[in-house]
Amino acid sequence: PDPTLASAKAGAKQMLDFKPDCIIALGGGSAMDAAKIMWVLYEHPEADFMDMAMRFMDIRKRIYTFPKMGEKAYFIAVPTSAGTGSEVTPFAVITDESTGVKYPLADYELLPDMAIIDTDFHMTAPKGLTAASGIDAVSHCLEAYASMMATDYTDGLALKALKTIFEYLPMAYDNGQTDVVAREKMANAATMAGMAFANAFLGVCHSMAHKLGAFHHIPHGIANALMLDEVIRFNAAEVPNKMGTFPQYDRPHTLERYAQVAEYLGLKGKNNAESLENLIHALDKLKARVGIKPTIRDYVPDEQSFLAQLDEMTRQAFDDQCTGANPRYPLMSEIKQMYLNAYYGKSFKEEPLPDAGESADDEHNFKQAYRREKSGVIGTAKED
């Protein structure tokens, strides 16, 4: 479950009562993230959550100075699932239950003092958690490698982790309670992926997954899996020719970067475009292999509910902290389009509403169409 600000405040209150000098965060990403916020509120009860959640362009040059951590308690993170990498990252994702907004907090003060990677804690993880966590780690690798803040150091971690996941996630999924080697490899891969994105940061896939999960209560790893194909295709497009977000990032070269990933995984094609398709196909096979369904609609069957919340979900995804490091900066219309494509599993195009005298039912199959009367358009699914 998504940790809430209220639960973190309640935990911090208990800490203030007995004043620990060491905090051990034992659990998956949600438990570790909640513990990080408890740690902050325990050491600095005066800290304002919205100040800490303030967005920034560069984590090293932010307007808000995060409070100094570690003066009261040492923080130890012990993951029990192989996915989030929170044990080695300066991030904590928390949901404000009063608004439903999911905030990814980021500052190097949130980095745990120690991480203990012990496979014994992973052996009883159920298949669903193994799959969702594993694909979350895949998205960490791909977004860190494509990030405009990627370096030689993060590249090596991301590539090695990704190759390990492709090899060992199916084994951990099938025989997780007995295959110690697969669990150990996945635990190490998730931590390596965490080290990669702790320095290179993430992108719009995570921005969209944060909001998809918050609005429709989809597990975070599944939400990333559902958006991954669309984001890869979006990032690999050859436009725009120039990026202006970071001056040191001359222009997008993401297609080439994805082709390098494909080559490292043994999926090289005749050219970069074919390598990209090979990579996407391999990702789809891996997701299906571990039981992840292909579309948002498989998890959110209420079409009208999804469409009713689409605009606000799009706005919040655009404003998410992770969007800034994406190699191609998206427009809100492009984020919305990716959500729609991921929902229906097809490419969509908006068309004018039919004339009043024309029966929409005669022209459009409502299983493959959506209506938004207030905007005066309908969207029709198109096969790729």
Language-model features, listed with the residues they occupy:
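Short, amphipathic C-terminal "tail helix"
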Residues: 305-384
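Short beta->alpha junction loops
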Residues: 1-5
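Carboxylate- and glycine-rich phosphate/diphosphate-binding segment that chelates Mg2+/Mn2+
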Residues: 88-200
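Flexible, glycine/charged-enriched surface loops at secondary-structure junctions
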Residues: 148-157, 172-185, 200-205, 243, ...
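Glycine-rich phosphate/pyrophosphate-binding beta-alpha loops
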Residues: 83, 191-224, 319-325
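Gly/Pro-rich interdomain helix-loop hinge
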Residues: 215-218, 222-306, 348-349, 354-356, ...
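Predominant activation on well-ordered alpha-helical scaffold segments within soluble catalytic domains
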Residues: 9-12, 36-39, 135-143, 159-170, ...
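Glycine/threonine-rich beta-strand-loop-alpha-helix active-site module
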Residues: 6-13, 17-120
